[in-house]
Regions:
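Short, hydrophobic alpha-helical membrane anchors of single-pass surface/secreted proteins
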Residues: 2-7, 25
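Short beta-strand edge/turn micro-motifs at domain boundaries
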Residues: 113-119, 132-164
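A mature extracytoplasmic/lumenal domain signature
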Residues: 72-74, 108, 120-124, 157-160
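Hydrophobic membrane-insertion alpha-helices, especially the h-region
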Residues: 5-19
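Ser/Thr/Pro/Gly-rich low-complexity linker/stalk segments immediately outside membranes or between
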Residues: 21-37
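Sec/Tat-exported extracytoplasmic proteins
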Residues: 37-44, 62-66, 90-97
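Surface-exposed, charged secondary-structure patches
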Residues: 85-130
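Short, well-ordered alpha-helical segments enriched in acidic and aromatic residues
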Residues: 32, 45-74
Length: 164
């Protein structure tokens, strides 16, 4: 009986270790979403070195083999862009803002044929250097593709909830 309990305990520890060290693809994709949100967020006391590191992290999360598609209402840069172009636009946009706070409110991941689709809702609070403040909650869809064993963002678009 004692040997059975020890065997069950060893199996339980092995399962927990497996789950911790080998997360599911969905968890890895959600982690990429967390990383891109963190690379865009900007606290008021952020220094130049932190900003540069975040810009590099942002660019590393994007597909650098193809253009990234952006289709977001009221976004001035809709269309297809290279990863370096988007990283440059992200850096410029962050310069105009005192703070950027993006919070993930919920996300659902679907993976099919090496393409991941994340339906998520994000809450934004942005304060510009000119004193304007924007608070908004919007649903989005992000698409990622597995490239060289890493999930890279290939598209961002608004999720149409209601059509006019």
């Amino acid at each position: 009986m004692k040997q059975i309990i020890i065997a069950i305990a060893i199996i339980a520890v092995a399962i927990v270790a497996w789950l911790l060290f080998f997360p599911s693809e969905k968890k890895i994709v959600l982690k990429q979403l967390d990383k891109i949100i963190e690379s865009v967020n900007k606290p008021s006391d952020e220094g130049n070195i932190a900003a540069a590191a975040k810009n590099l992290a942002f660019g590393a999360l994007l597909d650098d083999t193809n253009e990234i598609s952006i289709i977001i209402d009221e976004f001035p840069y809709n269309g297809s862009h290279s990863s370096s172009e988007l990283a440059s636009l992200e850096a410029q946009g962050r310069l105009y803002c005192e703070t950027i706070d993006i919070r993930l409110k919920g996300a659902d991941v679907e993976i099919k044929d090496g393409v991941a689709t994340i339906n998520f809702t994000a809450a934004f609070t942005v304060v510009t250097k000119f004193g304007s403040k924007y608070d908004e909650i919007r649903p989005f869809v992000a698409t990622l593709k597995k490239i060289d064993k890493k999930w890279k963002f290939t598209a961002f678009r608004d999720k149409q909830v209601l059509k006019k």
